[in-house]
Regions:
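Detector for C-terminal structural segments
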Residues: 15-22, 292, 318-352, 395-405, ...
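N-terminal lobe/hinge region of extracytoplasmic solute-binding protein
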Residues: 48-99, 130, 203-205
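A structural "hinge/loop" feature
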Residues: 51-68, 91-93, 118, 171-180, ...
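Gly/Pro-rich hinge or "lid" segments in bacterial periplasmic/extracellular proteins
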Residues: 72, 82, 177-236, 240, ...
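Aromatic- and charge-enriched surface segment that lines or borders ligand/interaction sites
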Residues: 93-138, 161-163, 252-255, 305
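Surface-exposed binding/hinge segments that line
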Residues: 143-188
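Ligand-site clamp/hinge motif
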Residues: 196, 228-274, 405, 414-416, ...
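Append "and occasionally in soluble cytosolic enzymes with long acidic Gly/Pro-rich linkers
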Residues: 214, 219-229, 284, 306-406, ...
């Protein structure tokens, strides 16, 4: 028994000694440091632009995309838009709206300065708005007429208010214009700005400042920008961004292969496969704000069958829209589910998708009283159903038209194609002198989803309700949606509108094309949402980086 107690004592002493040693070792151990790579400043990004240099001035870049791309980096707007099409502050720190929705009060960021160090003030906004309101034909007519209805009143150097004649919910979307420096240009009209030296060495308030022009044989071949250290959103990581001009997409791609550029601003469908097979080059695609649609004239005296919603739905079911995207557009489009773009905050994702199903189309037509004659032609009351499709006389639209013609022939409908110049196509829409028209609707004016101009009853006579769709309930929804400042109510109203559009199908939405561009994989943290303009690819350029370090 005594021997046993000694054994227990030895075990306890040994355990105590081991514990002391372990405690000592643990107290001497140093914590392991884990390095987390973080973006650091440095590097240069060079991008190929397709087109020519004209002038760097956001009031004059409406018709030249390369200028708009560069201006996006040089200048700032009052508001910009997130991936869902919602307005967020840019130069504007915040804003408020009056209870009746007619007065918008804005406060500018106190740390916003021009590239020459001068603070951005209310006077800069007032001057820029005055240019938009000017009688110059350099401002698009619809934009000029809109701004003539708006008054701007300074409150202080950093605050002001806009007054509208009536409540207009999409107003914020019209504030994406880029602001010009009044202290440098304030005594100049828009026409006087056209040939002003400012356009060759602009001063903006954006994340990058103008550095220099590249020239060759008297022609401008490139533009160099440098990160602006005092940008109100924080200095960008990439030190320099350079742009080089090329005549076409293929020449730009060859320049990438030769190491001249790091990015391609636009990819042609013909070059898509080469880009996909290029090691180290990342392809990015974003939906464009352009809807390819077949407008149906619901009041056409020569095509009364278009007045039947069931017939219109059969037309839609018979169209192989995915086939059009794959065969003609090389996959560079997404199916349209209605008049509001997918990804936008107002898009309702529970609409019918109208799958390609010729058998379903035939059955629907039979249920409506249509029948096929001995030659397989669709008839109603013994008369053949024959329609005419007007379309633009270019290879892409002609190829799409031929697929539509074949699809509808498969259900017995004879369709005659009428290719026309674009201007004539638009003129026929405006005069309602058509049966069916294939056209692309440009929805890029603002990211706001408001489809009022194309589908409201008030736009039937003299407006852009080309289909002449008469649905008083849908029109009421659209009227209310553009007047209320209640976001949740607007969303509900647009949902209700889309449900009615889906049920009645006054025209045939086909697809939204996508914009494709490519950037070398050494450029990191490129994040893209839907594009409302190709220049939107630079929305988060401040976060792009090339190098990392440890913190």
């Amino acid at each position: 028994m005594k021997k046993f107690r000694w054994q227990i004592l030895i075990v306890l002493i040994t355990a105590l000694i081991v514990g002391v040693i372990l405690f000592f070792l643990q107290s001497q151990a140093k914590p392991v440091s884990v390095s987390t790579p973080s973006p650091i400043s440095g590097g240069t990004y060079t991008e190929a632009l397709i087109g020519k240099f004209l002038r760097l001035n956001p009031m004059l870049d409406h018709f030249n995309q390369p200028d708009r791309d560069i201006d996006r980096l040089l200048f700032s707007s009052l508001v910009r838009f997130d991936a869902n099409g919602l307005p967020v502050g840019d130069l504007a720190e915040n804003w408020s709206v009056s209870t009746d929705g007619t007065v918008f009060t804005f406060n500018l960021r106190m740390n916003a300065v021009w590239h020459d160090g001068t603070p951005v003030t209310t006077q800069d906004v007032v001057y820029t708005v005055s240019l938009l309101q000017s009688e110059s034909n350099l401002v698009p007519e619809d934009l000029r007429e809109f701004w003539k209805q708006i008054s701007i009143s300074p409150i202080s150097d950093s605050s002001f208010e806009f007054s509208l004649p009536i409540a207009f919910s999409p107003f914020l979307d019209y504030l994406s214009f880029q602001v010009l420096p009044a202290h440098l240009l304030g005594n100049l009209t828009l026409n006087e700005l056209v040939d002003h030296p400012f356009n060759l060495a602009p001063v903006g308030s954006g994340p990058y400042r103008f550095d220099s022009l590249e020239t060759e044989n008297g022609l401008i071949t490139g533009v160099n920008l440098a990160a602006f250290d005092y940008y109100f959103g924080g200095r960008p990581f990439i030190d320099e961004i350079r742009f080089r001009y090329f005549s076409d997409e293929s020449s730009a791609f060859n320049a990438y292969q030769e190491g001249v550029v790091d990015g391609l601003s636009k990819i042609a469908p013909a070059d898509l496969e080469r880009v996909l097979n290029q090691t180290g080059l990342n392809l990015y695609s974003s939906r464009q704000p352009r809807l390819s649609i077949v407008f149906l004239n619901l009041r056409s005296a020569t095509a009364p069958v278009l007045q039947q919603a069931g017939f219109r739905k059969a037309l839609m079911s018979a169209v192989n829209r995915q086939g059009i995207i794959d065969e003609v557009l090389k996959g560079q489009a997404v199916l349209a589910q209605g008049p509001i773009m997918p990804g936008n905050w107002a898009f309702y994702d529970r609409q019918a998708s109208y799958k390609y199903d010729s058998d379903e189309a035939r059955q629907a037509l039979a249920a409506l009283g249509f029948s096929l004659d001995a030659g397989g032609n669709l008839t109603i009351d013994g008369a053949p159903v024959q329609l005419t499709l007007s379309l633009q006389d270019d290879p892409t639209h002609l190829a799409i038209g031929q697929i539509l013609q074949k699809n509808w022939q498969n259900i017995g409908i004879a369709v005659t194609l009428q290719p026309k110049p674009y201007d004539q196509l638009v003129a026929d829409l405006e005069s309602r002198a058509y049966e069916m028209t294939l056209i692309d609707l440009d929805l890029s004016q603002t990211p706001d989803p408001d489809p009022y101009q194309f589908w409201a009853e008030s736009q039937t006579e003299g407006g852009q309700n080309y289909s002449q769709w008469q649905n008083s309930t849908a029109s009421t929804y659209l009227e209310q949606a553009r007047q209320t400042s209640n976001f949740d109510l607007r969303k509900k109203l647009y949902r209700n509108f889309q449900v009615l559009f889906d049920e009645d199908l006054p025209s045939l939405p086909l697809y939204y094309p996508v914009y494709s561009y490519a950037v070398k994989d050494s450029i990191k943290d490129l994040k893209f949402g839907p594009l409302y303009n190709p220049a939107d690819r630079f929305n988060n350029v401040r976060s792009w980086y090339i190098f990392t370090g440890s913190e």
